[in-house]
Amino acid sequence: DEIVLVGGSTRIPKIQQLVKEFFNGKEPSRGINPDEAVAYGAAVQAGVLSGDQDTGDLVLLDVCPLTLGIETVGGVMTKLIPRNTVVPTKKSQIFSTASDNQPTVTIKVYEGERPLTKDNHLLGTFDLTGIPPAPRGVPQIEVTFEIDVNGILRVTAEDKGTGNKNKITITNDQNRLTPEEIERMVNDAEKFAEEDKKLKERIDTRNELESYAYCLKNQIGDKEKLGGKLSSEDKETMEKAVEEKIEWLESHQDADIEDFKA
């Protein structure tokens, strides 16, 4: 692969140096005029759009400028379509509820490179309702991201148990970021990478502990599983311990990772 400098500003020595450093010391190719490259690309794209038969063997690929995903427990950005994915594209992933007997899930769609949604850009929100009563984590909610050739994003959420679904469509001119804002978000992700990594690890550890506590709670209450194998005294002791842990988690959202591991 070659690194090609495109655009007049790439003649600036400092920019060339930064590009070289970004690619771990690999020298950019200097055999292409950066101004001519822009003009050539624009001409080819114009030919493709106008249906010129001579451009039949040429393909210009559009890519997703920022990672797309949804918000999950703890404000985590769960990624579905990574940055620089060639479009059109489609990706699905299974999610579930965050509490027992939850009748509605809210799907918040974000773009950005940070691990928490508070640092990314909200594109849209919609609700999936009518979820039958069930323990936390049991319902199967399939979320699908689809980007067409025009860059239009369609997000669908479907309850696999009932077939109930809802969706949102986000166009290119609807609450989207400018190229300058996109560049800033990418730079921020690199700048705060180490800090974000530690924060994400703490939240993941908390979520794992919470999931384990609720799973154990459900098993204790199920006579066909752990609940049927315990004596009344042991069952009462375990139920009390689990409830205390859940209450502690709810009142210590910002505890240190060491506390969650204790």
From Swiss-Prot:
Modification(s) after translation: In unstressed cells, AMPylation at Thr-162 by FICD inactivates the chaperome activity: AMPylated form is locked in a relatively inert state and only weakly stimulated by J domain-containing proteins. In response to endoplasmic reticulum stress, de-AMPylation by the same protein, FICD, restores the chaperone activity.
Modified residues (Omega-N-methylarginine): R136
S-S pairs: none
Residues modified as N6-methyllysine: K229, K235
Segments for region (Interdomain linker): 53-63
Residues with the N6-succinyllysine modification: K91
Positions bearing N6,N6-dimethyllysine: K229
N6,N6,N6-trimethyllysine, modified sites: K229
Sequence positions bearing Phosphothreonine: T162
Keywords of the record: ATP-binding, Chaperone, Cytoplasm, Endoplasmic reticulum, Hydrolase, Methylation, Nucleotide-binding, Phosphoprotein
EC number of this enzyme: 3.6.4.10
Subcellular location: Endoplasmic reticulum lumen; Melanosome; Cytoplasm; Cell surface
Catalytic activity: ATP + H2O = ADP + phosphate + H(+)
Key word GTP-binding present: no
Modified residues (O-AMP-threonine): T162
GO terms assigned for molecular function: ATP binding; ATP hydrolysis activity; ATP-dependent protein folding chaperone
Binding residue positions for ATP: G8, S9, T10, R11
Documented activity regulation: The chaperone activity is regulated by ATP-induced allosteric coupling of the nucleotide-binding (NBD) and substrate-binding (SBD) domains. In the ADP-bound and nucleotide-free (apo) states, the two domains have little interaction. In contrast, in the ATP-bound state the two domains are tightly coupled, which results in drastically accelerated kinetics in both binding and release of polypeptide substrates. J domain-containing co-chaperones (DNAJB9/ERdj4 or DNAJC10/ERdj5) stimulate the ATPase activity and are required for efficient substrate recognition by HSPA5/BiP.
GO BP annotation list: maintenance of protein localization in endoplasmic reticulum; negative regulation of IRE1-mediated unfolded protein response; negative regulation of protein-containing complex assembly; positive regulation of cell migration; post-translational protein targeting to membrane, translocation
Assigned protein family: Belongs to the heat shock protein 70 family.
Comment text on domains: The interdomain linker regulates the chaperone activity by mediating the formation of homooligomers. Homooligomers are formed by engagement of the interdomain linker of one HSPA5/BiP molecule as a typical substrate of an adjacent HSPA5/BiP molecule. HSPA5/BiP oligomerization inactivates participating HSPA5/BiP protomers. HSPA5/BiP oligomers probably act as reservoirs to store HSPA5/BiP molecules when they are not needed by the cell. When the levels of unfolded proteins rise, cells can rapidly break up these oligomers to make active monomers.
Function in brief: Endoplasmic reticulum chaperone that plays a key role in protein folding and quality control in the endoplasmic reticulum lumen. Involved in the correct folding of proteins and degradation of misfolded proteins via its interaction with DNAJC10/ERdj5, probably to facilitate the release of DNAJC10/ERdj5 from its substrate. Acts as a key repressor of the EIF2AK3/PERK and ERN1/IRE1-mediated unfolded protein response (UPR).
Known partners and oligomeric status: Monomer and homooligomer; homooligomerization via the interdomain linker inactivates the chaperone activity and acts as a storage of HSPA5/BiP molecules. Interacts with DNAJC1 (via J domain). Component of an EIF2 complex at least composed of CELF1/CUGBP1, CALR, CALR3, EIF2S1, EIF2S2, HSP90B1 and HSPA5. Part of a large chaperone multiprotein complex comprising DNAJB11, HSP90B1, HSPA5, HYOU, PDIA2, PDIA4, PDIA6, PPIB, SDF2L1, UGGT1 and very small amounts of ERP29, but not, or at very low levels, CALR nor CANX. Interacts with TMEM132A and TRIM21.
UniProt protein name: Endoplasmic reticulum chaperone BiP
Species the sequence originates in: Sus scrofa
Phylogenetic placement of the source organism: Eukaryota, Metazoa, Chordata, Craniata, Vertebrata
Gene giving rise to this polypeptide: HSPA5
